[in-house]
Design a protein with these regions (language model features):
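Conserved, mostly hydrophobic/aromatic
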Residues: 61, 138, 187, 228, ...
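Short, basic, low-complexity termini and linkers enriched in Ser/Thr/Gly/Pro
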Residues: 2-14, 159-167
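Bacterial signal peptide processing site
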Residues: 21-23
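Substrate-binding cleft of secreted/luminal carbohydrate-active enzymes
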Residues: 233-235, 239-295
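Substrate-binding surface in catalytic domains of secreted glycosidases
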Residues: 148, 152-239
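Catalytic domains of carbohydrate-active enzymes, especially glycoside hydrolases
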Residues: 44-70, 127-129
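C-terminal motif of bacterial Sec signal peptides marking the signal peptidase cleavage site
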Residues: 17-19
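Chitinase-like catalytic core of GlcNAc-active glycosidases
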Residues: 27-39, 67-190
Length: 295
C-alpha cells in the first residue's frame, strides 16, 4: 500500500515537472522587454513620442518598412508604401524591420520573393545607415488556404537570413492559434482586430473580451514563444455617411491582458503596444500604460 502511494506521488511530481519544463521551453530565448509598433510612412518622432520611449523603457520598435501586395494585374507580389527615414531612434532602442504581406500573396508560391524581401530590407538598412539590426518580422493574416505556402515562404526567409544570423518572427492572430506553429523564432500575438467590423454596433471590432475568451484555452499549449501586442489606437470610419469612432476602453485592455496572463503567465514577459503616435499616447493615462507594460 505504501509503495502504491509513493508511486502515485512520484507520478504527480513527474507531471508537475513536465508542465514546468513545457512552460520554460515555450519562452526560451524570449527577452523580457517593452516595445512598440511604428506604422507610419515616415520614421519621424516628435518630443512626446521620444519621451514615451524613455518613460516606459522601450527597447524595441517594430517598424513597418513596406507592404507587399499583389500588383495591378494580380500576377506577382510587389512592394508598396515604403517608409522614409527622416529621423533615427534614440541610442539603445533596437529597430525591427517589419513587412506586412497581404494574404492573397500567399495563395501560390512566388519564386525568389523571400530573397527579394531580405535583399530589400538589407539595402534599406545600408542606405539609411541603420545598424545593429538583429531581426526581421513578417506580418500576414494567413489562413488555412495560404498557410502551407506562407510557412514555406518563412522557411525561405530563414534560409536567406542565416548567413547574417538575424532572428525571424511573425505575427499570430487569435484564429491562427489552432494551426500548427510557423517556422520562426517567436510569434507576436496580435490582441486587436478581434471582432467583426460589420457587427460594430454589438461589439468593439478592435478588442472585446467576448471575442478573445474562446481562444484563452489554446494559449498554454501553443508551442511557440509569444510576445503580446495590445491596441492603443483609434479607428475612425464612415458608415452610411456617419462618422464612427472605435476606441478601446483602458479597462477592457487590462481585463483581456489579465485573462490571457492567467492562462499563460509568461505572456507578460514581452509586451508591445500598437502603435506609437502622440494621439495614441495621450488617449490613455500614464497608469494605464504602466499596467499594460507590467511584467
Amino acid at each position: 500500500m505504501r509503495g502504491e502511494r509513493l508511486a502515485i506521488v512520484f507520478c504527480l511530481l513527474t507531471l508537475l515537472l513536465t508542465g514546468c519544463k513545457k512552460q520554460h521551453s515555450q519562452d526560451a530565448g524570449l527577452e523580457q522587454c517593452n516595445s512598440v509598433y511604428f506604422w507610419r510612412t515616415d520614421l519621424k518622432l516628435d518630443s512626446t513620442e521620444k519621451a514615451f520611449l524613455s518613460q516606459y523603457h522601450i527597447k524595441k520598435v517594430y517598424c513597418r518598412y513596406f507592404d507587399v501586395v499583389m500588383n495591378d494585374d494580380a500576377t506577382e507580389p510587389s512592394p508598396n508604401a515604403t517608409i522614409s527615414f527622416s529621423d533615427t531612434l534614440p541610442t539603445g532602442v533596437e529597430i525591427i524591420p517589419t513587412i506586412y504581406i497581404t494574404e492573397d500573396c500567399m495563395h501560390k508560391p512566388h519564386k525568389n520573393l523571400a530573397k527579394k524581401i531580405v535583399d530589400r530590407v538589407l539595402q534599406m538598412n545600408k542606405t539609411n545607415d541603420i545598424n545593429h539590426v538583429q531581426e526581421i518580422q513578417i506580418d500576414c493574416d494567413y489562413t488555412s488556404r495560404s498557410r502551407k505556402n506562407y510557412y514555406q515562404f518563412l522557411e525561405e526567409i530563414r534560409h536567406h537570413l542565416s548567413p547574417i544570423t538575424y532572428q525571424l518572427s511573425t505575427t499570430i492572430r487569435l484564429h491562427q492559434l489552432s494551426m500548427p506553429a510557423p517556422p520562426v523564432d517567436y510569434g507576436v500575438l496580435m490582441v486587436y482586430n478581434t471582432g467583426d467590423p460589420r457587427k460594430w454596433q454589438e461589439r468593439n471590432p478592435i478588442l472585446d473580451y467576448r471575442d478573445v475568451y474562446p481562444y484563452l484555452s489554446q494559449l498554454d499549449k501553443y508551442p511557440l514563444p509569444l510576445a503580446t501586442a495590445y491596441p492603443v489606437y483609434q479607428w475612425i470610419r464612415n458608415i452610411q455617411n456617419v462618422r464612427v469612432e472605435h476606441t478601446v476602453e483602458a479597462e477592457e485592455i487590462l481585463k483581456v491582458k489579465k485573462a490571457m496572463e492567467k492562462e499563460r503567465p509568461s505572456l507578460s514577459r514581452s509586451i508591445i503596444t500598437y502603435h506609437i503616435e502622440t494621439d495614441n499616447i495621450n488617449r490613455y493615462k500614464p497608469e494605464t500604460y504602466e499596467e499594460i507594460y507590467r511584467h
